[in-house]
Amino acid sequence: ALVSVAAVLGVEDGRVTTLRLGLGGIAPKPWRAAAAETLLVGSEPTDEAFSAAIDLELVDAKPLPGNAFKIDLTRRTVVAVLRRLRDEAVTT
């Protein structure tokens, strides 16, 4: 995999109650996205919030030569995964 995302998202009453977010393929070891988790817990689970959280998480990322594309790929993948989890949580 070029990048991977592992996530657990809990939503109650229109707010993120739980979030665990791990990223793979963008660092020498799996990366726990603690800043993104902290920002999102308590917020509304919108695509904009997801995007802002992963942008905050990756603001200091320093990709190796030839791997800069992985930062944008990670951003898009995180938002897509969290959107899917949110939509599943809302419909179940």
Give, region by region, the residue ranges found by the protein language model.
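C-terminal structural segment of proteins
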Residues: 1-92
